Design a protein with these regions (language model features):
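Feature for soluble, non-membrane regions of globular proteins
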Residues: 1-193
Length: 193
């Protein structure tokens, strides 16, 4: 199965000034696209060629895993942001967040701290556990909840290419801006349901 670069769920300049058109041109158009091209090349003539992306992620390793997981992670990540994002979750997700951390403010502080402290390149996730509770999980490199029993609700990309054009080495500022101005709680709530 030939994989293609999924379109962004908004215009390429829709997240400005918090995430620039230039960042998305590089991050989506070059980095995300490179994972697609790499996977298509790596899977040729293998058992993975006929599999869907999520199946490849669960059954592969090495370069095929890294590229397939990065395709999925990035596609998921784009939907975790929206123009005029921010705010707080509602409904069942808000209740789960409050049950775990006591308040949205405490959750936000914990999420930003976890993302800032995620050493090197990786992802910080809000996940739903098998028992219905929520937690914050860091993964390194191409790590993804798809290979665990956790269900991904929300993620922030903390690879430097995700924020370096706009934020340089200020990962804390990127993480704080993501939570206050970009996060798409509607998407996370739909994933929690």
């Amino acid at each position: 199965m030939e994989h293609t670069l999924p379109a962004l769920p908004y215009a390429i300049d829709a997240l400005a000034p918090h995430l620039s058109k230039e960042t998305l041109e590089f991050h989506h158009g070059k980095h995300h696209n490179a994972y697609v091209v790499n996977l298509n090349n790596l899977q040729k003539g293998t058992e993975f060629e006929s599999m869907k992306l999520e199946e490849i992620i669960k059954k592969s390793s090495g370069g095929i895993y890294n590229n397939s997981a990065q395709i999925w992670n990035h596609t998921f990540f784009w939907s975790c942001m929206k123009p005029a994002g921010g705010g707080e979750p509602k409904g069942a997700l808000a209740a789960a967040v409050t049950a775990k951390w006591g308040s949205y403010a405490a959750f936000k502080e914990a999420f930003v701290k976890s993302a800032v402290g995620n050493f090197g390149s990786g992802w910080t996730w809000l996940v739903k556990k098998a028992d219905g509770s929520v937690d914050i999980v860091n993964t390194g490199a191409a790590g993804t909840p798809l290979t665990t029993a956790d269900k991904a609700l929300l993620t922030i990309d903390v690879w430097e290419h995700a924020y370096y054009i706009d934020y340089r080495n200020l990962r804390p500022k990127w993480c704080e801006t993501f939570m206050t101005s970009l996060v798409n709680w509607d998407f996370a709530e739909a994933n929690f349901a």
